[in-house]
Amino acid sequence: ESEFYIQVVKQGQTVACHDYSLRELLHDFGDLESCETYEYYNHNVNHGQGGQRRVTAKGWSLLTLLELLPEIPQREELENGSVKFQIFTNDNYKEKIVLEANELSAYRFLLAYEQDQRSQDGLEKGDTSSWADEDLHFAPIKGTTPFRVYCGKESANPSVYKNAAGMVVTILF
């Protein structure tokens, strides 16, 4: 059963669609798992006043997952503007955003399945640790999918895609 897909499009045609469950990703790519920390402004924290949120997420670099696929060109082609991508969510949020593949490495896009979440102004819904806590307390991602995609765009949205369901990669040549 697919919980996250990567669809590859070339010259307007789908040339491949790779479907993954969380179990498959853990089994097949567990050795490629990484941990990233992201800090970003969230307008919902601090009783709607806004504030800083820090997330340390476990998962897989989207760039690394792409580089494993036979349809994906070499990294230099990924980074020269010849490839674009979109991240899709189950709630259709942010789907119109099309990015260039070089942003995958520049902003550390991570397909996360567990996270330690904390808010600077006190515990908020979903937080697993206090801001000052030295230890990380990971919890599974909860939502309509077991994934979120985080990226290191601290000063520009989006920093997080909730309920991540898949991505479409378009090869322009």
Functional labels for PLM-detected ranges:
Residues 1-173:
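N-terminal intrinsically disordered, low-complexity segments enriched in P/E/S/T
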